[in-house]
């Protein structure tokens, strides 16, 4: 008997142990990401050829305690390597694990390599050569918890590579993962009609057809790890291989299970057909190009097993939620009597199905943790007769309180916005605590920002509520799902607002009281325009005529644009970010503003204020400053806290202010307290002007910001 370890993705251990038991292996023991077992050589060959779940089979040569480099060397040296391979063969070592005396895997691999070549030389043979690529013999070594395991890669390249893929292009679902889906769903135990409406390159259906037609998954592989092993029994292997070929030929002829696959992408369907042809199961599968929402059940009962789209690259969150909701609705209406098994990495999308799972499991698609849910669909005696709203969302079913509130808000604000001369405004701001989001309209686009939920609320609850919000929005306010952008907002920490979210750009031009601004709805947490400061910007513009204006922490320069349009004599725009200064220049260009009177300065604003406060010639008639609540950017010399540091900040700013000048000071700290007593002693006059700067669309959230008018006393 020989000792082996069958490696597999995390979550496969139970299924793999069951498979090995069915093969006839003994001493089966589940471990992390794999299963140990023993088997005679002939059975090991059979397992390697027929396993549908394992990624790799290794022959365990040594396993024992290891507490020093010397012990590691001795463990490898004591093995009779010449019994496993010739010195004419090349070999490589793949070492995993660190700890204790092993600081890095290269050190461990080197020790084992030295032991192997020394053993060959001491036995009177020439040393074998190491080949990092395409070695004849591959040694796998694992060090964990003071135990070293030394093994030989018995199976060769990863077993999920069956050999039927006709391209090395995108293959999001590995073959052994598809096989495990078929096993855990219960389909493999009783094969019946199978449908995959998101078949992609056909992996689930091809793996199922291989099972139903009794075709060994390794039959088309061109290489196995044991081929250069000295104990390889070519005759036994040939016999097992020929038996598998005969079973495959007979199995295809006898297979009476029906397989149906479809995908909306004709290129993927063509690829699926080629893959099925290569796998020898083309005649068993009916492929077609179709939208999953238009696919009809091909039989009265069966299995629908699929890996539907998820992830931002495949569409907006709202679009995907709509898709999943409509799928769930279709399943309930049309697939009574069927079983559904679905793999998805996003709990929000799964919850949008609005189906109760019989069983929920965890699987890994590569490093991506996924939910694998099983559903039993019961035939409905009656169908819902009420009309379905756009995109299949019934507003009465999905978050009715939220839907009704935002619908009411939108109706009230639309007329107001048109009268104001603006096309970007807030529709909803956590009006209902359960739906803890902000919803902003930017022309015909919607941005949803999720606030950080209290720790007391389970994550599953917050995700379900967010899912319901995104599902209800299109019908409630008449917006296309693909024009909804989702963002997650937490309490501002340091430079969070300046962090890039992704490389995509969804850019629009918005209008605000005659000024034009560029928006980027996807690139950053904020869009380039703080909507709550709309009236503050207009106030700056109204106060700017003939004045020297300074805008600090300027962001994208929107207040500077209003100042320039308001007739400012000069405008100086200061920000630490080159990205936002470039954006500010674009905003100036959009408004046909150019000239030497408009200066853009890249600098740490706090340091720039300190330096300028000593320059008596640096005088401004109007200063607008909207500092962050807190900042500790690496590019700034010191941290900044607006509550702690505002007195010192205003004390420096007042030195830059002309005798009749004004400072408009604003910040977003909700519990900010102005230290008026200290400022009065410094001969600084302070007046709160919140009532003048809170727009109608923010009346529901009066503490969104606080604004002050500051002058010389």
Curated annotation (Swiss-Prot):
Protein name listed in UniProt: Ribosomal RNA large subunit methyltransferase K/L
PANTHER family xref list: RIBOSOMAL RNA LARGE SUBUNIT METHYLTRANSFERASE K/L, RIBOSOMAL RNA LARGE SUBUNIT METHYLTRANSFERASE K_L
Principal location class: cytoplasm
Family matches, as HAMAP family: 23SrRNA_methyltr_KL (MF_01858)
Domain of life according to the entry: Bacteria
Substrates-to-products reaction catalysed: guanosine(2445) in 23S rRNA + S-adenosyl-L-methionine = N(2)-methylguanosine(2445) in 23S rRNA + S-adenosyl-L-homocysteine + H(+); guanosine(2069) in 23S rRNA + S-adenosyl-L-methionine = N(2)-methylguanosine(2069) in 23S rRNA + S-adenosyl-L-homocysteine + H(+)
Described purpose of this protein according to its UniProt entry: Specifically methylates the guanine in position 2445 (m2G2445) and the guanine in position 2069 (m7G2069) of 23S rRNA.
Family, similarity comment: Belongs to the methyltransferase superfamily. RlmKL family.
Positions of the THUMP domain: 43-154
InterPro entries, A to Z: 23SrRNA_methyltr_KL (IPR017244), DNA_methylase_N6_adenine_CS (IPR002052), RlmKL-like_Mtase (IPR000241), RlmKL-like_Mtase_CS (IPR053943), RlmL_1st (IPR054170), SAM-dep_methyl-trfase (IPR019614), SAM-dependent_MTases_sf (IPR029063), THUMP_dom (IPR004114)
Enzyme class: transferase
SMART domains given in the database record: THUMP
Keywords for this protein: Cytoplasm, Methyltransferase, RNA-binding, rRNA processing, S-adenosyl-L-methionine, Transferase
Enzyme nomenclature, EC number: 2.1.1.173, 2.1.1.264
Annotated gene: rlmL
Keyword Transcription: no
Lineage: Bacteria, Pseudomonadati, Pseudomonadota, Gammaproteobacteria, Alteromonadales
GO cellular component: cytoplasm
UniProt-annotated location(s): Cytoplasm
One GO MF term attached to the UniProt entry: 23S rRNA (guanine(2445)-N(2))-methyltransferase activity
